[in-house]
Amino acid sequence: MAEAAPQEAQQNFAIQRIFLKDVSFEAPNSPVIFQKEWNPDVKLDLDTQSRELGEGVYEVVLRLTVTVKNEEETAFLCEVQQGGIFTAEQMEAGQLAHCLGAFCPNILFPYARETISSLVVKGTFPQLNLAPVNFDALFMNYLQQQAQQGEAQA
């Protein structure tokens, strides 16, 4: 009888929960800003953070901050922290880093984008549709920067 080959542990990824962790909307120059011609200058800042909650369970938080200026005055400032709890088991360190730094933010981004769009409309500003973000490219840039910093310190 042939011996059974040892089974490798299977990778496991699952979404446990997606939640809104923090939200803020400010329109410091309203209502005066509504009387001006609308020619917005949009600035988007984003950041991701992750932490282990338990064995193979991680929280990932995507923070988006949108600042819109019109004629050099702040029309509105909107910040959303979209969180998710994910199961990520049996992954090598590099795979896990990519999962938490790119794959999970890709999952969270549409939720954060919709929240921002909704808040902007509720502030009676024209709808803001954020373009998709390539988190894979951002993650690769991050890895390259880390490698360059490591070489510079060596």
Curated annotation (Swiss-Prot):
GO terms for molecular function: unfolded protein binding. The keyword RNA-binding does not apply. Keywords: Chaperone, Cytoplasm, Protein transport, Translocation, Transport. GO terms for biological process: protein folding; protein tetramerization; protein transport. It is found in: Cytoplasm. GO terms for cellular component: cytoplasm. InterPro entries: SecB (IPR003708), SecB-like_sf (IPR035958). PANTHER family: PROTEIN-EXPORT PROTEIN SECB, PTHR36918. Homotetramer, a dimer of dimers. One homotetramer interacts with 1 SecA dimer. Belongs to the SecB family. One of the proteins required for the normal export of preproteins out of the cell cytoplasm. It is a molecular chaperone that binds to a subset of precursor proteins, maintaining them in a translocation-competent state. It also specifically binds to its receptor SecA. HAMAP family: SecB (MF_00821). This is Protein-export protein SecB. It comes from Vibrio parahaemolyticus serotype O3:K6 (strain RIMD 2210633). The gene is secB.
